[in-house]
Structures are given as C-alpha cells and as structure tokens.
C-alpha cells in the first residue's frame, strides 16, 4: 500500500473530481427547492465541470477483487429523477442523436434529461459513499469503476443532456428580446 499522501485517491485531480461529484449529489438531492431558471443555471455550470474533472483524472488500476459497493437505492434514484422531471415538465424529453441504437433506426429516439442526470447521480453518489469509507483500496476501486463508467456511458449521457439543457436555458424572454434586437438591427 502506498503512503497516504501519495496514493492515487489523494492526488489533486482525483480530489477535485470527487469534490465536484459530491457537489452535484448535494444539489440534485435538493433540486425541488430551486426555481426552474436556477436549476438550469446550476446544472449547466456543474455538468461541464464534472466532465472536465473526470477527463483530468489519470488512469489507475484496481486494487481489490470484486465490485465496489453500490449505495443508491431505487427510491433515492427515483426521487432525484422525479424532481428533475418536475422541474422540466414537458421539456424533459428530447430527441437523441448520439445513441448507438440510432445507427439501426429510421425513427428518432426519445430520451429523458431526468433519467440521464439520475444515472449520473447514481454513479457520483456511489463514488462519494465509497470515498467516505476512508479505505484507500475501496476508494481507489470506486474511482477506477466510476471513470470506466464515464468512458462507457455516463460521459456520453452528460454530453447528450447539455444540448437540450442549453436550448432550454435560452428559451426564456431574454433570448426572445435578444433575437428581436439582432433581427431588427440587420
């Protein structure tokens, strides 16, 4: 086992990534308390930061045999998903163009922002809870598993929801006034 000060789980990129992951979890667990505009502003700030921090963590190897513990219950997952869905209402759905299934389909595929963000939440919450064990090997393997999942699915889900969230954030009155200004100017 490495010296605690130099172990992979305590290096700056790992700590920064886990810190953003925890911030996302805390925010999503209280998302019902925010107004829609505040929700969009916050989620559009934290998701790109989470993506960046995940990309900056160097690769590591597993230290233990077996799987890391999963902490998120179905009820917790559903509570987060439903809170996000309530914030977005009918704007929760979007047409997905970057799914593997699209290559074999003539029909557009509908996806849900709330479901994709809840999937990301589950990965981040499991990571955060494994980090709380303060067992370096468990922390290491949870981080390795989370980063593998980033490459396999949640990184793409994060990028996929940014497009519709961005459009929603611009679909307010301010955007309409800006469009009017530019169309009358030219």
Question: PLM features: what roles do these ranges have?
Answer:
Residues 16-23, 42-49, 53, 79, ...:
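Charged, amphipathic alpha-helical oligomerization/scaffolding segments
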Residues 32-41, 63-66, 97-104, 138-144:
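Short glycine-rich, low-complexity/disordered patches
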Residues 2, 8-9, 15-74:
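N-terminal interaction modules that seed assembly of large macromolecular complexes
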Residues 3-4, 108-111, 119, 123-186:
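Acidic, proline/glycine-rich low-complexity IDRs
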Residues 8, 17, 39, 71, ...:
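Phenylalanine-focused residue identity feature
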Residues 60-128:
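Long amphipathic alpha-helical segments
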